[in-house]
């Protein structure tokens, strides 16, 4: 990966890394994608 909330220095962040947070919940990287599941920027 090159960009995305679950990418750091062209490598995937580990599964379970917080990729975005709201006041009521957190969403976590899967370790298999540079995109965050349910990330608002995903369209």
Curated annotation (Swiss-Prot):
It comes from the Eukaryota. One of its GO terms (molecular function) is toxin activity. Residues 1-43 form the Disintegrin domain. Keywords: Angiogenesis, Cell adhesion impairing toxin, Developmental protein, Differentiation, Disulfide bond, Secreted, Toxin. Disulfide bonds join 1-10, 6-29, 7-34, 19-36. A motif (Cell attachment site) lies at residues 21-23. One of its GO terms (biological process) is cell differentiation. Expressed by the venom gland. The keyword Transferase does not apply. SUPFAM superfamilies: Blood coagulation inhibitor (disintegrin) (SSF57552). Monomer. Specifically interacts with the alpha-1/beta-1 integrin (ITGA1/ITGB1). Exhibits highly inhibitory effects on cell adhesion and cell migration to collagens I and IV. Also shows in vivo anti-angiogenic activity. Belongs to the disintegrin family. Short disintegrin subfamily. This is Disintegrin CV.
